Design a protein with these regions (language model features):
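Short "pre-J" leader segments immediately N-terminal to J/J-like domains in DnaJ-family
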Residues: 1-14, 24, 59-72, 79, ...
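N-terminal J-domain/J-like co-chaperone modules of DnaJ/Hsp40 proteins
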Residues: 2-46
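Short amphipathic alpha-helical molecular recognition features
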Residues: 14, 23, 53-56, 117
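Acidic (E/D-rich), amphipathic helical modules within compact regulatory domains
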Residues: 37-73
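Short boundary/loop segments of OB/S1/cold-shock single-stranded nucleic-acid-binding domains
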Residues: 76-86
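Accessory regions outside conserved functional cores
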Residues: 85-149
Length: 149
């Protein structure tokens, strides 16, 4: 993985964890508890006659929601829950389409499943574009090498 892409994506994950006040060992239950408590404190409806406070709360709420959903999607418990489905997709369904957006490789399979691989360097993506079989390339160089959701 290219160091700057890895750093950018790891920084994003770190910022999300910091926002929610959790570390990488947080369970789904921990994430849910922190999310609910944070949303209670930052919910825009708490700021009835305070437009500035309401606007700040809306921004914080959006950030908290984004962080929560992202961290849940990469959590080991979530990945374990969907491991069988993921394994079946990457071994039995060929790639229909794929594209790179801000070092996130989005891969659409013919079975309708889409996965995002975080921190994929542009040069790896270009090699995948030029590969005879993007599915085989992904099995060898993408799957198992990058955080996915």
């Amino acid at each position: 993985m290219h160091p700057e892409n890895r750093d950018t994506n790891m920084k994003r994950i770190g910022e999300y964890r910091k926002l929610l006040g959790v570390d990488q060992s947080a369970t789904l239950k921990d994430l849910k508890t922190v999310y609910r408590n944070t949303m209670k404190d930052a919910h825009p409806d708490k700021f009835v006659n305070d437009e500035a406070g309401k606007a700040d709360a809306e921004e914080k709420s959006k950030s908290v929601i984004e962080a929560y959903h992202f961290l849940v999607s990469i959590n080991p418990e979530t990945q374990e829950k969907y491991k069988e489905e993921y394994t079946e997709t990457i071994t039995q369904s060929i790639i229909q389409d794929f594209y790179l957006e801000k070092s996130i490789l989005k891969v659409q399979h013919f079975n309708g499943k889409m996965y995002e691989y975080i921190g994929v360097p542009r040069n790896t993506y270009i090699k995948m574009v030029n590969a005879d079989s993007p599915s085989r390339f992904a099995r060898r160089h993408i799957y198992g090498n990058f955080i996915y959701r």
